[in-house]
Every structure is written in structure tokens, then in C-alpha cells.
Amino acid sequence: TATGYYTNNTPSGAMRTFGVLQPTFAIESLMDICSEKLGIDPIELRMINGMKDGAVTHTRQVLGKVAYTETLKKCSEIAGWEVGSSRVRGSVRKDIKGSQIAEPYIPGKEFKSEEAMKLCRDRFKYGRGVGTGWYGIGRCATIDKAGAFVEIDDGGTAMILTGVSEIGEGILTVLTQIAADELGMYPEDITIGDNDTARVPEAAHVGASRQTYMIGNAVCNACRDVKKKFIREMAAYWNIDSSSICMKNRRIYVEGNAQYNLSLKEAVDICKKIRGIVPLGSGTYTAHHDGLDPVDGRGNPWHWNLGSA
């Protein structure tokens, strides 16, 4: 049995990296309070204090590229946010400028009856606000790793095998796009196979926003491996230098030479039936960390980081 206690702590879990949402909510709330008291636009205050390239974290890690202010600036441009007093920001402003002009929202306008519109206006307030975040991705206590297999199949298509789990984050689409780009195919030519970890390489856990970075790189490396082998076999068949061969738009060819230009389907047939080779590739990706000092907490836990707005 278990006993649960109701407290004033925010419910938490592993959604968008462990332990980030809860303090971010508090920090962003305080940033708005500070901007109000100081009379500084909330976006301007965040631009002044936000993480920038070369920033040092609380663990003394020196960051490389940090996209926080860049992301916030782009978001403010799209939203048509004009710098000014935080007291006058909101959807009723007439002087909004930006790449996309936002029309003021009229509460209840979607309702047909006056009574429903009035009820909506009395209950809800509408305006605009800003929220930002920054965090590192992947495992920070241990080495993070992932692996993948790729096979170029009959018909000039490809099969990706990895232990990735799709729980709604869209990783299968991302891996399909990565593979298609690397192999010169279209997304519809890519199939993501069974993720039974007894038969496919480890992809590790779903969480900490790591899948695109870790598994995406593993798939990318696997595609480059099979592409190199595939081109090598076709170069031997054509008796030419492999460095001159390209794979793009479902074809394998030498630029400007019609003599060496085949569909991937035709090339796979040659590779299998004449060369006797099944085009297979494998790839791994590892993010190395030096861990954290158990005494003072210093270290470089993050291999990459994200900024959001």
C-alpha cells in the first residue's frame, strides 16, 4: 500500500526533461513580477538576463551555442510584440507592430447569443504574455548512447531498425526525415521497423528531450554507413571512382554523365543479384559527459542545450 499527501507543490513528472517545468514556472512568474515593478518590458528583461553564448551554468559548465535570446527575439517578431511598459501589453493594443499583425480578440465572439458572450467576458480575461525556458538535454549522470541499423531494400526503399519508442513526440517522423535526406530518398520510401530491443540496437529511454539528438544522430550515422557501402559496390560495378557518385531524388548517378545514372531500384538489383551484396549499415552515437563532482556539484553534464519561448 501507499499513502499520498496533498501539498502545495506543483505535480511533477518527466515531461520535457526532469525537474525543469516546476522551477521554470516559478522563475517565469517572478520575471513578470520584476518587469511590472521595474517598468521594463517582460521580453526586454528576459533579453537582458537570458543565457547567451559562453554563459556559465551553476555547475560551472561553459556553454557553447545558446539559442535562448535568438529564439525569444524570433518569437516576439512573429507575435508582433512591441517593446513597451508591461502595464499596457495585451490583446487590446492598437499599435502592435511586427511581421504578423495580430487582431485584438473579442471575448465571446464565437458565441451567437448575447447572454453567452456576456458570460464569457465576465469569466475570462484575454491578453498576451511571454514564457521562456532553457535546459540541457539527455542524460547528465552517465554516458548517453544510441544505435541503429539501416537496410536498403528491393525497390530502392529503406528500413530503419532501432529501439526507439514513439509515445506521441513525433520521433518516427523525425527519423524518417533524417534517413530520407541522407539516402537521397523521399520520406514515403522509409519504413521504421519493429522496436523489439531483443532484435534491434538500444535506443535508451524516452525523456530529457534526447531522442532527436541521440537516436537521430545514430540513424544519420547508420545511413551514412550503408550509403558508403552501397556507393562503393556501384563504383566497382561501373569501374569508376566512388567519390564521383551521388545519391539524390531516388537515383544514383555521376553528375553530368548519363552513362552512370540509375534509379535506386535498379541499383539495388545490381548490388544484390550481380554483386551479391545486401546493403546494410549500422551506426551509433555517444554523448560523453564528465559527470558531476559529488562534493561541490561541479561538472559538464550537458552535451547540448535548448532555448524555448
Where are these predicted regions, by residue range?
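Phosphate-handling active-site elements
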Residues: 183-187
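Cofactor-centric catalytic regions
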Residues: 1-5, 26-29, 36-38, 44-159, ...
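A short glycine-threonine-serine/GTX helix/turn-capping micro-motif
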Residues: 10-23, 208
